[in-house]
């Protein structure tokens, strides 16, 4: 059997980040050839990542960052809470937000090899669950909110108005989880399904058509729209008004938002 020195093991570990015994076994299998041993570790890492792919990643970290006129938000998932606090995991998550902030969501493809290697070293699935980047145009502001202490829910908002109000909106979105900014964004077929459900409720039977239509619209507003549409939701900072009313009061408007949540 080829004699493997401690310095060879250290060099391979420095190259690959592999655990000591894995590095030593790879060197033995490769007959002491560092490059071949590194390739063996890489192949084993790919196999390990493929085996773990698809495992649920309900822990992890959401990170948001704003730099001048652009901002980014990413959600990097792990299987367990301890890994979400692991220095290697956190270092990888920082690389993801750096890449997305500078180059956009497609930049995460350049980190795939590193992700695979990390999966092999840590021993559980790690995935970039979501990545988005916004550019603020004339008169627009960006704001973000990541909910402490777990940092598993985060929001990035692009709006017209003050940064302070935009941040309050981001906090609202984190808690209320709307899917659309305004009613105009809701697909017509989705509204039609909701109307159909309401029309079949027993308490509407026998009502005149105009009364029935009014009741359906009222229930849509208080139910479906208040749940799904940001501007229709009760403002968490003052439930006596809707988000839309709060925005109008300040001459503000939400242009876009993204919300990521790691459920667990």
Residue ranges of model-derived segments:
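N-terminal assembly/interaction segments in proteins that build large macromolecular machines
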Residues: 2-264
């Amino acid at each position: 059997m080829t004699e493997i020195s401690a310095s060879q093991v250290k060099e391979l570990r420095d190259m690959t980040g592999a655990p000591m015994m894995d590095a030593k076994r790879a060197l033995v299998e490769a007959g002491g050839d560092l490059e071949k041993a590194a390739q063996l570790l890489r192949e084993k890492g790919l196999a390990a990542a493929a085996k773990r792919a698809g495992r649920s990643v309900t822990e992890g970290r959401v990170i948001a960052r704003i730099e001048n006129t652009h901002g980014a938000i990413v959600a990097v998932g792990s299987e367990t809470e301890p890994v979400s606090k692991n220095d290697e995991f956190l270092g990888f998550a920082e690389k993801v937000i750096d890449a997305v902030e500078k180059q956009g969501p497609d930049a995460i493809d350049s980190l795939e090899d590193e992700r695979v290697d990390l999966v092999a070293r840590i021993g559980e699935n790690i995935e970039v669950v979501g990545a988005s980047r916004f550019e603020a145009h004339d008169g627009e502001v960006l704001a973000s909110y990541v909910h402490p202490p777990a940092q598993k829910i985060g929001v990035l908002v692009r709006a017209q108005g003050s940064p302070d109000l935009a941040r309050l909106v981001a906090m609202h979105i984190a808690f209320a989880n709307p899917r659309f900014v305004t009613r105009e964004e809701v697909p017509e077929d989705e509204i039609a399904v909701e109307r159909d459900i309401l029309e079949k409720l027993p308490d509407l039977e026998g009502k005149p058509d105009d009364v029935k239509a009014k009741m359906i619209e009222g229930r849509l507003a208080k139910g479906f729209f208040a749940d799904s549409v940001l501007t229709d939701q009760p403002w968490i900072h003052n439930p006596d008004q809707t988000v839309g009313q709060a925005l109008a009061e300040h001459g503000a408007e939400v242009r876009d938002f993204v919300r990521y949540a790691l459920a667990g």
